[in-house]
Amino acid sequence: LSERVTTFHQQLQQENILKVAPLSHDAIAGFAVGIKETIEELGWQDAALLMLVQPKERNWFDQMGLFAALSQRGVKVVRATLAEVHDRGKLRNGDLWVGPQRIGVVYFRAGYSPGDLPDAESRSARRMMEASSAVLVPEASMQLAGTKKIQQVLAGSGVLSQFVPEAVGEQLKAYFAMMFGLEEEVEGRTAREFLAENAEQYVLKPQREGGGNNVY
């Protein structure tokens, strides 16, 4: 959808309503090329992209733009919910199949919120995908890294040095925002007292990915 906003801004610029020309924005084409190259790298000419969607999908038109770009490049697309993956999916020698179609890449447009995993069947489907040879966008570890508690832990003293050289860790920290947990331990109680006095300078975020669900 952001690509459409860019097109709108370009039109406004042509009509001299905007004085600065917006930068080009080819996210959909870039996405399609990346998926196609990933499947080619796997060496599976018959593999498809599994687009994981919600049962009552609200972003249908957004997804159709991606679907069209992939189809133009010869990439097959299978749209399915977690329940459908559970019912129709299986592992064959470690490869993920949904019905008669082998899956090379799983693109998660669902599965980010607790409501997407309401029962044992949906969680079983997620575990099956994680255990497969398919490329997951994102895999569980990357998805967890998008949650605030994991980000808070990674920002802690001495943690980044376990993954990157200390000098690189110091450079990364320059881009971190200060984060406080609100647990019942001493640190959490101290943080609550501090935040009560400085509430207008902080955002209350739940343990969820993405930029929503915030309290200002």
Please give the residue ranges for each predicted region.
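Domain-scale recognition of functional cores that engage charged ligands
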Residues: S2-Y216
